[in-house]
A protein has these predicted regions:
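Extended, hydrophilic extramembrane loops/domains of integral membrane proteins
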Residues: 90-143
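Membrane-proximal low-complexity regions enriched in glycine and acidic/polar residues
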Residues: 24, 28-82
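Short, mixed-charge, low-aromatic patches
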Residues: 14-24, 71-79, 104-108
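Mixed-charge, polar/low-complexity N-terminal
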Residues: 5-6, 11-12, 85-88, 126
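Internal alpha-helical transmembrane segments
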Residues: 1-38, 132-153
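Charge-dense, low-complexity intrinsically disordered segments
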Residues: 3, 53, 108
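Exposed beta-strand-loop-beta-strand "reactive/processing" segments of non-cytosolic proteins
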Residues: 74-98
Length: 153
């Protein structure tokens, strides 16, 4: 490939990904400066007798049923287990935390602020499609850096 094609490819990739990189730099910089965002938590009443078996083979279906029984219409891509609780993912938008307690199940609705949502995307906790975009962006950034270095020499 001749030099002009490399320059055009480099500039196109750089121009396309600059807005994304600016958002990543801003969200990461604000996080490091202590602006981590916030999450508004609301406890949701759970039906009497609701239970949650964290070792269930049908955990996704169990959680979907528990949410539906509580009157919550929510689609999630996967669950993250931690201790005696489960978190629906992605956490870059409204999500739910279900905790197994001695009294049954505690469900809490979590609504992240814009900054918290940006941090969650930055950490890779966004939707699966966005994660694929991030992988592509990482390759494009590597291309921009290497081609820029090579073209500058």
């Amino acid at each position: 490939m001749n030099r002009s094609v490399w320059i055009k490819a480099h500039l196109f990739a750089a121009a396309f990904f600059t807005p994304v990189l600016v958002v990543i730099a801003i969200s990461g910089g604000l996080y490091l400066l202590g602006f981590k965002g916030s999450v508004e938590e609301t406890t949701i009443p759970t039906p009497a007798g609701a239970s949650l078996n964290l070792d269930s083979d049908t955990l996704d279906a169990d959680v979907a049923r528990l949410l539906a029984d509580a009157g919550i219409s929510h689609e999630f891509e996967y669950l993250r287990a931690g201790g005696n609780s489960l978190t629906t993912r992605p956490t870059s938008t409204t999500y739910y935390v279900l905790a197994a307690t001695a009294d049954g199940v505690k469900i809490s609705k979590q609504v992240p602020s814009l900054q918290k949502s940006m941090i969650e995307l930055h950490k890779g906790h966004g939707p699966v499609l966005f994660k694929e975009f991030q992988k592509f962006m990482a390759l494009a950034l590597l291309f921009v850096l290497l081609s820029g270095t090579w073209l500058g020499l």
